[in-house]
């Protein structure tokens, strides 16, 4: 149990699957921020995909269904069917890698990283937004609630809107993600209204419902109980010719290349925040390289949605 909400993600293997790369760059914001780099396990001079595909598959029902729906599976003693039902819903909703339906890798990864690394717990995923709540025409990819304590010991809450982009070039991924953030910002009143009207029905635990009510419905003459923030998952092509380097050197090359890339692009992310007057928001950015971003994001989700994974 987090600070009020339960985590939906099964994250115990996350640190084994996603290797974090330490660096010294930041966004220079006055608000809270994260700028974190990860890569998959390197094996035989390439990123090993099997583990992440299995992990996503095992989390698919937690991604697709609300807490209330998952509890219904439990009460019906039918939890074993939740994964297959979730996959069926996704296949009915669209093809693997179809953006906007919840079937694109970035849409699932931004949910996973905001829950697993930020501890901002899910209110709605992209699948839920597109299947359960289409009338609201949400442009977010996931919506989360973060409850934290600042350096002075004062608690604060943030409604975190997630977006993602996975494409060959990191700069292009940043540009695309900020285009999406601006769309979310332009529709923020509608997004917040949707959460306020529907979030309680998606919970089942009375304590969680009461916790959300205290945040989303302020008492008379009281100010807002939360701010809005943005979470980004960015994927790009690594750009290292693995045939030219021995296997034992490849991971060191990956780490060095990622640090070089973030040194180049962190100022650009900060610039995008500044020029779009977004500096009053917290930003949480998670970056993962691929061997071939376009092919890998399709291949991973195709295997997950087919159930063609290693268990």
Each model region followed by its residue ranges:
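A structured, charge-rich N-terminal accessory region that forms the first stable segment of a protein
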Residues: 2-85
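A short, highly charged nucleic-acid-interacting micro-segment common to nuclease
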Residues: 88-111
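Extended, charged low-complexity segments
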Residues: 244-311
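Acidic, metal/cofactor-coordinating or nucleic-acid-engaging core segments within structured domains
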Residues: 174-267
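Glycine- and acidic-residue-rich phosphate-binding/metal-coordinating active-site segment common to enzymes
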Residues: 123, 130-214
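Short acidic, S/G/P-rich loop/turn micro-motifs used as interaction or catalytic elements
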Residues: 46, 167-169, 238-242, 293
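Extended, Lys/Arg-enriched charged tracts that mediate electrostatic binding to polyanionic substrates
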Residues: 105-137
């Amino acid at each position: 149990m987090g600070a009020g909400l339960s985590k939906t993600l099964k994250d115990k293997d996350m640190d084994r699957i996603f290797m974090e790369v330490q660096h010294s760059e930041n966004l220079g914001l006055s608000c809270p921020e994260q700028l974190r780099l990860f890569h998959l396990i390197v094996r035989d001079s390439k990123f090993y995909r099997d583990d992440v595909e299995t992990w996503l598959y095992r989390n698919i029902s937690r991604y697709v269904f609300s807490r209330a729906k998952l509890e219904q599976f439990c009460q019906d003693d039918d939890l074993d069917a939740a994964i297959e039902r979730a996959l069926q819903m996704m296949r009915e909703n669209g093809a693997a890698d179809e953006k906007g339906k919840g079937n694109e890798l970035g849409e699932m990864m931004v949910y996973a990283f905001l829950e697993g690394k930020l501890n901002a717990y899910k209110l709605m995923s992209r699948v839920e937004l597109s299947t359960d709540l289409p009338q609201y025409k949400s442009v977010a990819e996931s919506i989360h609630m973060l409850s934290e304590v600042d350096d002075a010991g004062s608690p604060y809450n943030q409604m975190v809107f997630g977006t993602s982009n996975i494409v060959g070039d990191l700069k292009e991924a940043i540009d695309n993600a900020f285009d999406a953030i601006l769309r979310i910002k332009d529709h923020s009143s509608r997004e917040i209204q949707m959460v306020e009207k529907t979030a309680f029905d998606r919970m089942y635990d009375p304590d969680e419902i009461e916790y959300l009510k205290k945040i989303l419905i302020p008492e008379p003459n009281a100010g807002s109980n939360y701010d809005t923030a943005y979470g980004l998952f960015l994927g790009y092509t690594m750009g290292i010719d693995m045939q030219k380097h021995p296997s034992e050197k490849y991971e060191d090359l990956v780490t060095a290349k990622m640090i070089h890339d973030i040194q180049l692009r962190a100022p650009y992310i900060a610039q995008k925040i500044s020029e779009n007057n977004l500096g009053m928001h917290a930003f949480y950015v998670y970056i993962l390289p691929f061997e071939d971003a376009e092919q890998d994001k399709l291949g991973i989700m195709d295997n997950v949605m087919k159930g063609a994974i290693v268990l």
